[in-house]
Amino acid sequence: MAERVLIVGGGDGGTILANALDKRRFDVTMLTASPKHMFQPALLYVAFKNASRDIAREQRTLLDRRVRLVHDAVKQVDLKAQVVTTASGERYEYDYVVLGTGIRTNPGEIPGLAEVNAEFGDYHSSVSQAEKLWSRLDAFQGGTIALGQSTPVIKCPPSPIEGILLTDELLRKRGLRDKTRLVFFTPYPRAYPAKPMNEVVEPILRERGIEIVPFFDVDKIDPETRTITSIEGDEIVYDLPIIIPPFIGADIAYEPANVVDASGFVIADKNTMRVKGTETAFAIGDGSTTPTSKSGVAAHLEAQAVAKIIAGEPAKYNGRTHCPLDMAFGRGTFVIGTYDAPVRKLPPTRLKHWMKMAFARFYWISLRGWLEPMFTVYFKLTEPRP
């Protein structure tokens, strides 16, 4: 009898895993609240370039026909009884469960941020929020734009740098750069957290006249005075704020409750993705505590490793990251590293930018696993060394 694999979440990790599992051995069911799958990196280009083509597709079209797809929100996961309960009250028993729940924004964590993001939008929450941000940028005629992350943990670590550089590009093309003060704030001691990449990034920001404010931990925002205040009491006054909100785990109750941390992220082994204290539960993607970037590539590689582990094959995820970084004006680079190898210093080139654009085009077929041989060779050739 086929073993039952339950996948919670229809993101890239869950979709890749569902397609990778051998359907002759496993009865695969995916539970996801949304009928559509969104290519989340596209929000960057909705917000800063008004590009909204091919952002989402029907989840059913991305899955092997033998995968059972159920559109229902998961509300409870009982890891002891091996049962998942949905919002409709349905109960699903499993032999293996893979939690690809993703994460959600939590602007209410910071006083004033919910009001600010409701007014100005952001490029990490939704298509509508990204469209709102574009409308604000499109109407902007000069003043101070302040962009940064409100907390250290965000989706796609390069995205703050991408946002500020694409803002700079937009302003220059519209002849507004000399009328604008661009401020980039970060809770880290430098513009990019990893020092080797910062040696690439920070000189470019300074060359383009972007002010860098390090060690800026956002405490509150006053929409009336248009002021962002740090925990240390420093202030940034803005005309247009672009603030990446805090993130928390999915709204799911777990039994036992101690398998999630204070932010709701599922505690998992960094190499096997097994959930704390279990042998039959795994957590992949943004919603886990694995100490790697919350990115599509990480979820992809975690999913491939979990597929092998469930099949009884030896496999480990080594923390590999491969995040594309759009440096604006047709140039780009990648943030590449593993748990054991430090992030590499890779200067931007036009080729790297086009590689990012090409992957966006190939994203949908990559979910089916059809490009896996190519990815395997590419990741091996670009593997960083300790």
What are these language model-derived features?
Residues R25-T29, V67-V84, Y92, D168-G264:
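A Rossmann-like FAD-binding core segment of flavoenzymes
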Residues A2-R68, T151-K195:
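Beta1-alpha1 glycine-rich phosphate/pyrophosphate-binding loop at the start
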Residues A2-E3, V67-E162, L166-G175, I242:
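FAD-binding core/adjacent interface of flavoenzyme oxidoreductases
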